[in-house]
A protein has these predicted regions:
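N-terminal secretory signal peptides
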Residues: 1-19, 26, 42
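N-terminal twin-arginine translocation
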Residues: 14-19, 30-48
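A generic secondary-structure signal for well-formed alpha-helical elements
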Residues: 28-31, 35, 206, 346
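Small disulfide-bonded, cysteine-rich extracellular recognition modules and tandem repeats
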Residues: 23, 44-46, 77
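Active-/binding-site microenvironments in catalytic and ligand-binding cores
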Residues: 48-422
Length: 422
């Protein structure tokens, strides 16, 4: 890309000069690297076809017929066995983890990337009732709190320190709220901010992954099948598909939206990431193949709408006009490789507000991946660090909350990667 194209796009929206120059320079560096031929970082990325082990099948957007979810013929029992609760996490074997670690070359600096959003009180979330909320409160013990602390919602346990050594301490609690649908105040959830959706999260009617039926495993405390106790931890190969970076480098500003209030670019609100985009992003990042047990992550720039906690940005983040992402054809194309997780920096992974959404289906990609394929979904992963350093292949690790019966984990994943020189 001619960096002037990016400068013109950013100046149109009055982005500050420092960001304009930095991003234009980065785009130019990526183009230079791409034109020179980016070498894969490991044996797993080989110089083969971008499709890797592509079956060559004909993948389409035809919705699965959920008129009779009890017809399990093509998706249950799972390829991993009739009683399986781990899904594609089964692909993350000891050998897979060892191969993933070989991505890191001896003697080269390794950077640790936090892929999680910073949570704050009032963090936005998909609207449900009862609401998904995050309202943290500090508790104090051992001294008199400052003026206004209690009035603002802080909690004083005692002003008296403990013991002869006058021990004082801080802890956190989480505020709860009443809902018209439930008589007991409810507090936070793992289904907020950066999260990894588990297989017990989404189904069709009574039916969930591997044919498990909701009435058979729903309990007051959580699910008795497909809960977080069957999920992690995992350490495996991660692959970044930088759709935003690729569009910037190619000068395709028509696929971009108005920048966030911090001046950072993002994909157009209802932009559908196609299979062709995926293959092009693999080539852009020097990724030769997607392998079983990989974690595949899409960067769209959507997380920049949370950077300043700006009301207008947050409204856009909630996606009243749509959100970029994949749809069924892309989900099915990726599922053939049996990745452990497919995720993005948006809160849904799948495209919203696009004409393909006009068929009346609600979050069909979630059903396709979680229920039919046992592939977990990552949401609101922060991918700017690896993208800025042109780290398209890395070691991915996450340990979701080890919470019995939970439907997701919102512990931030990490990536270990070796930055490329610009």
């Amino acid at each position: 890309m001619n960096p002037d194209v990016l400068r013109n796009y950013l100046s149109k929206y009055r982005t500050n000069r420092r960001d304009t120059l930095r991003m234009a320079g980065a785009a130019g560096a990526v183009v230079v690297a791409s034109s020179a031929g980016v070498q894969p970082a490991s044996a797993e990325t080989g110089n083969g076809s971008p499709a890797g082990t592509d079956s060559g099948g004909d993948f389409d957007d035809k919705p699965f017929d959920y008129a009779d979810p009890a017809n399990l013929a093509d998706w249950a029992p799972s390829r991993y066995g009739a009683g399986d609760q781990r899904g594609a996490f089964n692909e993350v074997t000891a050998a897979k983890t060892a191969a993933a670690l070989s991505v890191l070359k001896p003697g080269k600096p390794v950077r640790t990337y936090n892929l999680g959003e910073l949570m704050w009180n009032g963090f936005p979330a998909f609207k449900t009732d009862p609401r998904r909320i995050h309202e943290q409160r500090l508790t104090i013990a051992g001294y008199q709190p400052p003026p206004g602390f209690l009035e603002a919602g802080g909690v004083l346990m005692t002003t008296e320190p403990l013991g002869a050594n006058k021990l004082s301490y801080h802890e956190e609690r989480f505020a709860a709220e009443l809902s018209p649908l439930h008589p007991v105040p409810l507090a936070s959830t793992f289904q907020i901010a950066t999260q990894t959706d588990n297989l017990g999260h989404i189904g069709a009617g009574e039916y969930y992954y591997n044919g498990f039926r909701g009435p058979d495993f729903a309990a007051a405390h959580g699910v008795t099948k497909l809960g977080n106790e069957h999920m992690g931890p995992i350490a495996t190969r991660g692959v970044l598909l930088d759709i935003l970076g690729m569009k910037l480098a190619e000068g395709k500003t028509g696929d971009l939206a108005e920048p966030a209030s911090n001046g950072k670019p993002l994909l157009r609100e209802n932009y559908r990431i196609t299979v062709e985009d995926i293959k092009a992003a693999m080539k852009f990042g020097g990724i030769g193949r997607i392998s079983p047990g990989d974690v595949v992550l899409f960067r769209t720039g959507w997380n920049q709408l949370l950077a300043r906690r700006d009301a207008g940005d947050i409204l856009r983040w909630e996606a009243p006009n749509g959100m970029p992402g994949i749809y069924l054809r892309e989900a099915r194309w990726l599922a053939q490789f049996r990745p452990a997780v497919i995720g993005s920096d948006t809160w849904a992974l799948e495209v919203l507000g696009n004409p393909v959404n006009d068929n009346g289906s609600a979050f069909p990609v979630h059903q396709e991946l979680l229920m039919r394929n046992g592939i977990r979904i990552g949401e609101s992963y922060v991918l700017d660090g690896p993208a800025d350093d042109r780290v398209y292949e890395f070691v991915f690790a996450v340990t979701p909350q080890f919470s019995e019966g939970a439907t997701a984990g919102n512990t931030p994943p990490l990536a270990l990667g070796q930055p490329r020189r610009h």
